[in-house]
Amino acid sequence: MCDNDMADIQSKLSSFCEEIRALALKEGYNLEGDKSPSSKPYFMSWPKEIDVNHPNFAFFTKLQFQYDKSLETILNSCYLQELQLDPTRIIETLQQHFNNSILRYADIENISDVKDESPMSFDTEHECTDTSEDISDKSEISSTNSDNPIQNCYPTYKRSFIKHESRGILEKIFKVKQCPNTSERLYIAQKLDLTPSQVRIWFTNKRMRAKKHTTGKGTKRKSKKYPS
C-alpha cells in the first residue's frame, strides 16, 4: 500500500469522524471542547504464531502499519467520550481483526500473488455497487429443513434483528453517508452494539430500497399523461 493510499484512508476516516460529530451536535450532544485523548501512537500486537523470520513478515508489517494508523485516528479524533464509546473495546476488536488478517496469510508462500482481503480494507468500487436486494446475514445458515433433501438444496438464512432505536440512528447516519467503508461500519457497529456484518447488510439493503424508490418515481413521471 503506497503513501497516497494511506493518506486517502486517513482523510476518509477523519472526514467520517467530523460527520459523526456534526450528527451528535444535531441530536443534542454537548461537544463543546475536544475531550478526546491527546494524540499519541498506538501499535497492534503480533500474534504469537508470527515472528520476524516469517517469509511474509514484510507484508505483515505493512498491514500492521495500516491498522495502527486507523486505530490512532479512531482513538484520537473520533470523540469517543462524547459518543459513549469504550476505547478498550475498540482496541480489542481491531486487535482481533488484525490477528485474523495475519493468520489468514500465515501459510501462503507467495504473498505477492494474493489480493489484500484484510477486514480493514477501505471502500472498493464493488462495495457500493448494489446488485442484489434484501440481503440477509449469510453467515447464519438455518438448518431447520435438514429432513427435507429438496429444501436443503436451497439454504435459508436467518434475518439479523436490529432494534428500533438502532434502526433510527442508522437512518440518520444514512442521510449523512450512504456507503460507509469498512472502518466506518466497524465504528457504527461499536456504537450500536451490532456486528459489522449487520451494519453492512443494513446499508446495502437501504441503498437498494432508496434506488428502487428513486427509479420508480422517475418511471411514473415519464409515463404520466398531460392534457393537450
Swiss-Prot record:
Region (Disordered): 120-149
SUPFAM superfamilies associated with the record: Homeodomain-like (SSF46689)
Basic and acidic residues composition-biased segments: 120-140
GO cellular component terms given for this protein: nucleus
Keywords carried by this UniProt record: DNA-binding, Homeobox, Nucleus, Repressor, Transcription, Transcription regulation
InterPro entries in the record: Distal-less_Homeobox_TF (IPR050460), HD (IPR001356), Homeobox_CS (IPR017970), Homeodomain-like_sf (IPR009057)
SMART domains cross-referenced by the UniProt entry: HOX
Cystine residue pairs: none
DNA-binding region (UniProt annotation): 155-214
Gene Ontology MF terms in the entry: DNA binding; DNA-binding transcription factor activity, RNA polymerase II-specific
Family stated for the protein in its record: Belongs to the MATA1 family.
Quaternary state and interactors: Forms a heterodimer with ALPHA2.
Protein name: Mating-type protein A1
Organism of this sequence: Kluyveromyces lactis (strain ATCC 8585 / CBS 2359 / DSM 70799 / NBRC 1267 / NRRL Y-1140 / WM37)
